[in-house]
Amino acid sequence: MTSNSFNPYDYEMHEDPYPTYARLRSEAPVYRSDEFDFWALSRHEDVIGAFRNVDAYSNAFGVSLDPSAFGPDAHRTMSFLALDPPKHTRMRSLVGKGFTPTKVSAMEDRIREITLQHLLPALEAGTFDFIEDFAGKVPMDVISELVGVPTADRAELRRMADLVLHRDDGVYDVPPEGMEASLTLIGYYQEMVDERRKVRTDDLTSALIDADIDGDRLSDDEIVAFLFLMVVAGNETTTKLLGNAWYWGWRNPDERAKPFEDANRIPNWVEETLRYDTSSQMLLRVARQPIVSHGITIAEGERILLLVGSANRDEAVFVDPDRYDLDRDTTKLVSFGSGRHFCMGAPLARLEARIALGELVGRVADYDVDPDAMVRVHSINVRGLASLPTTVVLR
């Protein structure tokens, strides 16, 4: 493949990256881009191996190619996602004191209430934008509820999170409006932390302030970075997961029929969507030492993209990988990473998706999508839809 065959910023690539991924796996499993100064690993065994090998693959410069997001200060906005052990171990342990599985599971009833709050008016309308009216609102409200953001502020915070992720065609970095949105979000969360230090409330922000391991506590900057990560990464990826599930269900009516006829199949719908068209397409690492893969040496300090979306379509692991199949074994998907950096928010994302799709299936007999009016998000890391007009037939 030529040096410019794989451009992760290219709008055409965003429309359908999977044929390119297939060529990379076949022809260039260790791919070099001189234009953007990175290597890319596309095969499942290489991607999962890199996730698990923290001695050779570093997160310390962030997980994005964007020049303004790449560097030794990436942890200021990407939290422990941009740290290596032992710093990563320390911070993840402290965050885990507040962001517990018990806290997540205790939110189930509230997540269902939030889901219905947005779903029922949309269903009553009959035709609505699946993203704008539903899938974009539920995860934002859930994250906001969890961390303590007032209802009145949530729409604006979601708008700013969208600005951080979006790239105009031909733009290869966080645009000025995205930088401004990042600074606004950081300022907002800093004020919220200041307020909680004065008066605690029953939310994750207060729990993070109080998190303590042998006298070690999180600083304000560390708490703000984690809150920023939650709203930008946690919120947006779950929105895209819901939109992708709804869209690919529509594209594959025989598969869609399975959860619509048996709600116990909803977890299969979630997991196959995570495999087939994952929200998080690629994550960056930096070589901590010379790495030899497929006879090619990657020098210390070089940037390496782990192509998660490609790994999930690897024919060496998944039979007929380009088929959307709710009956397949998805246990080897790498959508949430692997090893020490396995996504801490995975249980929450899965819970939200199962509840949201479950409430839809319980009320909707069938639905249609307007593909001509569909709008795709253009982002280097995140794949999904910004608009998905849909019309439902109620049960």
Each model region followed by its residue ranges:
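Cytochrome P450
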Residues: 1-395
